[in-house]
């Protein structure tokens, strides 16, 4: 599920014609990888693309709040014993609701299934792994190169292409939508 940073750096060095590491430091290349992953996953979460989702068990203790995961960007769904909780703007929260303030979620004490959109944790060195599926590797490389070349417009175009590709991929998994129904009149 994760991509070794060393592999990404080697690919970037090849594309930049710097296999000996004379022009660019590992740090510069790793930073472009981090920026690419952050940009891509931030945009995927804005567009509600499933590929940027994670699931975890979240326990809200008796105090009524807990800290969200460190890679949390946006909530998709929070389901407890009583069913799905809905967002509220009020504190204190009531049964069946939750409120997020900064990195803290307020909810009725319970054990919840949390589905959320995330941004991969920053990588620091060549021995790390970037927490993204291998299918995203080419996009991360292309976005990194665009950012490294100081071309944010191209980076955004690649992100858009990736978002559209992944969104279509998700829809293509629907098996049978059932018979077509016409509502409100005759054909």
Which functions belong to the PLM regions below?
Residues 1-187:
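Glycine-enriched, solvent-exposed interface loops adjoining structured elements
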């Amino acid at each position: 599920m994760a991509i070794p940073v060393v592999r990404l750096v080697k690919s970037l060095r090849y594309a930049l014609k710097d296999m000996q590491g004379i022009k660019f430091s590992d740090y510069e290349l790793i930073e472009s990888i981090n920026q690419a992953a952050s940009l891509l996953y931030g945009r995927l979460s804005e567009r509600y693309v499933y590929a940027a989702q994670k699931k975890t068990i979240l326990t809200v203790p008796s105090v009524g709040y807990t800290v969200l995961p460190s890679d949390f960007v946006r909530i998709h769904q929070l389901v407890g014993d009583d069913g799905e909780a809905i967002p509220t703007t009020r504190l204190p929260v009531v049964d069946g609701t939750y409120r997020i303030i900064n990195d803290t979620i307020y909810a009725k004490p319970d054990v919840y299934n949390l589905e959320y959109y995330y941004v991969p944790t920053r990588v620091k060195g060549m021995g790390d792994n970037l927490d993204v599926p291998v299918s995203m590797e080419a996009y991360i490389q292309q976005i990194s190169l665009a950012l490294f070349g100081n071309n944010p417009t191209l980076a955004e175009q690649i992100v858009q292409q990736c978002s559209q590709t992944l969104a279509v991929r998700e829809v293509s998994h629907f098996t049978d939508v059932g018979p077509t129904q016409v509502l409100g009149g005759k054909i």
